Amino acid sequence: GLWKNMLSGIGKLAGQAALGAVKTLV
């Protein structure tokens, strides 16, 4: 449903942000 799609989108954004942060730190 809508919530699942929203959570999925947020998860993807969070994952990309985490990867970016890790790359900058490392």
Swiss-Prot record:
Coiled coil: none annotated. The keyword Translocase does not apply. Expressed by the skin glands. The keyword Secreted applies. GO terms for biological process: defense response to bacterium. Pfam families: DD_K. The modification Valine amide is found at residue 26. It comes from the Eukaryota. Signal peptide: none annotated. Keywords: Amidation, Amphibian defense peptide, Antibiotic, Antimicrobial, Secreted. It is found in: Secreted. Its main location: secreted. GO terms for cellular component: extracellular region. InterPro entries: Dermaseptin_dom. Belongs to the frog skin active peptide (FSAP) family. Dermaseptin subfamily. Has antimicrobial activity. This is Dermaseptin-J1. It comes from Phasmahyla jandaia (Jandaia leaf frog). The lineage of its organism: Eukaryota, Metazoa, Chordata, Craniata, Vertebrata.
